[in-house]
């Protein structure tokens, strides 16, 4: 069925829950996973350089958590850190580039005004992508 799953993570508790579901599903299906985290691109000078270093350190932590969960389940795992102003676009592009056949991700479940103002990365991945998406809450 599914052979290669993309697991986007933002380090949130909901994202960690989705990772656990994704790793368990990958183990059951004997599938490979690719973890991805996306941070905005920053300028290489000034205070942006400090922000970028912090974002890079967080990305390493997020991806290491996925690697650790995958290793514990004996699931093959790659991990990539992407930089893009639009996380949904980077997630869709990563899934295509890595030849994934399923995306497993969290939804924060925002409703009403906050959903309209903040938007939803998950909703945009579903709307703009071509792959099936397993949404975890």
Where are these regions (language model features)?
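Short, well-ordered secondary-structure micro-motifs
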Residues: 18, 45-48, 89-92, 115-117
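Short glycine-rich, flexible loops that bind phosphorylated cofactors or substrates
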Residues: 14, 87, 111-113
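Acidic, proline/glycine-rich short linear motifs
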Residues: 36-65, 93
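Gly/Ser-rich helix-loop-strand patches that form or flank binding pockets
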Residues: 24, 96-137
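Structural motif
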Residues: 36, 80-82, 136
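Aromatic/hydrophobic pocket-lining residues that form π-stacking "cages" and hydrophobic walls in ligand
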Residues: 22, 66, 91, 125
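Small/aliphatic-rich secondary-structure junction motif
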Residues: 3-49, 69-78
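Structural beta-alpha unit
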Residues: 71-103
């Amino acid at each position: 069925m599914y052979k290669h799953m993309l697991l986007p993570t933002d380090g949130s508790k909901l994202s960690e829950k989705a990772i656990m579901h994704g790793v368990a599903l990958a183990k059951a299906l004997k599938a490979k996973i690719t973890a991805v985290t996306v941070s905005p691109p920053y300028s290489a000078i000034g205070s942006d350089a400090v922000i970028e270093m912090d974002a890079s350190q967080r990305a390493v932590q997020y991806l290491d958590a996925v690697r650790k969960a995958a290793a514990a389940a004996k699931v093959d795992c790659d991990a990539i850190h992407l930089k893009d102003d639009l996380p949904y676009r980077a997630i869709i592009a990563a899934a295509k580039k890595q030849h994934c056949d399923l995306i497993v991700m969290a939804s924060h479940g925002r409703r009403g005004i906050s959903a309209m103002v903040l938007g939803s990365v998950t909703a945009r991945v579903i709307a703009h992508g071509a792959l099936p998406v397993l949404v975890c809450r």
